């Protein structure tokens, strides 16, 4: 047995990876220079830093789709992240791409998500817009807070007591571009964007079926016939398609048929699950909770932990957004209750006659 150090790993990349893959030796680097690790190439170090950071642990108690589900088997933001990482690594390995970069990007892509899922994200944007005097329904107002930008902000300056994780440029680019119209500069980042869509479309259907909100027969017939009749079949079909089409194209792509089938399922979920129905009944409460927390804290900065006040002095809305977006669902409820629910007085009963 022998030790394979960082230089050995980098040499292996040159032999094993595709010519289009990102190589650790060619990274654009970090914002702050630092000594290289003896064993780990740069992207593996990034993956490990994300895995060990506080924001990653908090994902275990943040909503994916269902607010405060009672069952043990519904996805959270953490399980979603792990599923994205698994799908992305499978694609990256099949295409000869850099698995460390792919996994680091996947593990970090949702670090900046708010409590209560996308409704929390919308509520925070709405509250920030009102604070700034911007129409909350305008394009600017609707997107003041975006979880992908917040994920980058976390790893650049909020984690590690304000020092950030000092990740490589490629990982930060992939995190920023995993959603929206802007494509990542690396193929590995583009793989994560595809894996994210595959994961949430397939597992949100799975969770909805488990909750009794949907059945397989409710799904559009075309995608079922093309992709399969179960979550695992659909994931397998889309992963195989991406690998085959991308290998031929030299870029990360799906075939038109599979892409349209996936987007048809996504549209179905928006129409039947994300924007209405039993799964969304609690969203108005969660929205109001986030807005009330923001409105209170933005005028009571003394109640915001010091670590969130180290940046953007003079911009209390940003400081409060940093704090609130980092809360888990349970912690947000607890802070809200502390602000709004009277506490019991232990000595009260002793004075009753």
Where does each model-flagged region fall?
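Short active-site segment of divalent metal-dependent hydrolases/proteases
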Residues: 108-116, 199
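Membrane-interfacial alpha-helical segments at the cytosolic side of multi-pass membrane proteins
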Residues: 119-125
